[in-house]
Amino acid sequence: MKVISSIQELRDQLRGQNRVAFVPTMGNLHEGHLSLMRLARQHGDPVVASIFVNRLQFGPNEDFDKYPRTLQDDIEKLQKEGVYVLFAPTERDMYPEPQEYRVEPPHDLGDTLEGEFRPGFFKGVCTVVMKLFCCVQPRVAVFGKKDYQQLMIVRRMAHQFALPVDIVPAETVRADDGLALSSRNVYLTNEERAEAPELYRTLHQVRQDVLETVLQGQASHEEVTTKAMDYLRGRGWQPDYVAVRRRSDLQKPTPENIAAGEPLVVLTAAKLGKTRLIDNLEI
């Protein structure tokens, strides 16, 4: 596996490769990331991964400086997965001058849910993903469903810009107790780690309530999610949101949508101690 930091060297290395499968990451790799590499191999060849902690998507009070950086361990893991190239640029490589041009998602998708609680986050995500796509020029790119809103935004961005890249979704990888694997799980104390799977169990309860009451016209989805947030608060969580949305565009479902059987998803973000966790479950 070649480890490359220069954009020009990356382009030279990939010249003539027209089925590149790409997996962008911020490093501190776990089994969830490695499953993306395996899925990428099913859709293209060679597999290219990137590791870049993107300052543009971190807010002023977020964990950019503390975000775990484990490059040597990550390199060893990617080598075992047979990754062809790891693109690991420095900030100077990616942003040799201030990044004045940005890619901003539409308000209805970029400023709700995560976008409401992390202003500017998706502008940073879209900008770096677009730049990585320009550097790698993949035919396929794999994004995990754990970051459901990010997946939807990147997919729409690729469509609206007519980018020649297929966005492939990957199922969330979970620990045996249901907790979604995340690089930020390392921040959890032992007690918090024992409590953390309750977030996924709460999503299952919301799904059950939607199926048994909302779809039967006996309750609104807002009543169901309010109950879920109250439940989490009672267990010591600080939920930002629990929300039922349409899978197609992450907008709130209307009664007509629900009656017509519109596919739905429930999404959540909540703090446990100092650690903010996100998760989702399709209904």
Swiss-Prot record:
Keywords tagged on the record: ATP-binding, Cytoplasm, Ligase, Nucleotide-binding, Pantothenate biosynthesis
Top-level taxon in the UniProt lineage: Bacteria
Any one GO molecular-function label of the UniProt entry: pantoate-beta-alanine ligase activity
Positions that bind beta-alanine: 57
Active site, per annotation: 33
Pathway(s) it belongs to: Cofactor biosynthesis; (R)-pantothenate biosynthesis; (R)-pantothenate from (R)-pantoate and beta-alanine: step 1/1
Subunit field text: Homodimer.
NCBIfam families xrefs: cyt_tran_rel, panC
Protein's recorded name: Pantothenate synthetase
Organism: Ralstonia pickettii (strain 12J)
